[in-house]
């Protein structure tokens, strides 16, 4: 049986990833971590481990211990913040499918540009410099609806599908 570690397993991305694994024909032993003890109750994992945040000095030692103690075959770090930290560790290269850390970014626009430059299909993206630019951006991108997103954050934080530039303006303000 393959053993998988899903970090950030209590967030919506982690929960959905675990659900996808459970829906497959294959049986997996899944260890889930999350820094939020309450979110850790959401995913259908076999083992739950409350972890410190990715920025805590104890995060990496704990991940290494989990990998060793549970004979983990594959690590799926769910939030981008944890993926970035784990991608920098050479001992985990064979246990993840993460790209080089230079491709990962906390900035969604940088990620979009890196993906585009590496021939991955991505949506057209514009950076808003001023609220007064909203109508022209909507026109340039086909009139809407458009996703309005913050450049940083996970889990769809500060994102909304807006039908008009007026709706986007109200969302931003």
Tell me the role of every PLM-derived stretch:
Residues 1-4:
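Extreme N-terminal starter segment of soluble prokaryotic enzymes
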Residues 10:
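N-terminal Rossmann NAD(P)H-binding glycine-rich loop of SDR-like oxidoreductase domains
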Residues 14-25, 67, 87-90:
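Surface-exposed amphipathic alpha-helices with a cationic face
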Residues 29-31:
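Conserved beta-strand positions in the Rossmann-like core of class I SAM-dependent methyltransferases
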Residues 34-36:
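Residues in the short beta-alpha loop(s) of Rossmann-like NAD(P)-binding domains
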Residues 42-127, 136:
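Conserved N-proximal alpha/beta basic substrate-recognition cap immediately N-terminal to
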Residues 102-173:
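Active-site nucleotide/adenylate-binding loops and adjacent lid/helix of ATP-dependent enzymes
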């Amino acid at each position: 049986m393959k053993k998988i570690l899903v970090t950030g397993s209590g967030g919506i991305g982690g929960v959905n990833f675990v659900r996808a694994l459970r829906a497959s024909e294959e049986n997996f032993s899944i260890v889930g971590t999350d820094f939020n003890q309450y979110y850790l109750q959401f995913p259908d994992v076999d083992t739950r481990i409350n972890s410190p945040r990715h920025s805590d000095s104890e995060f990496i030692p704990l991940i290494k211990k989990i990998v060793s103690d549970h004979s983990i075959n594959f690590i799926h770090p769910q939030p981008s913040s944890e993926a970035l930290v784990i991608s920098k560790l050479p001992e985990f290269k064979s246990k993840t499918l993460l790209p080089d850390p230079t491709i990962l970014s906390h900035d969604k626009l940088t990620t979009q540009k890196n993906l585009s430059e590496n021939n991955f299909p991505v949506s057209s993206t514009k950076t808003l410099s001023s609220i007064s630019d909203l109508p022209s951006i909507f026109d340039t991108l086909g009139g809407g609806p458009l996703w309005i997103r913050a450049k940083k954050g996970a889990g769809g934080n500060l994102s909304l599908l807006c039908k008009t530039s007026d709706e986007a303006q109200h969302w931003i303000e």
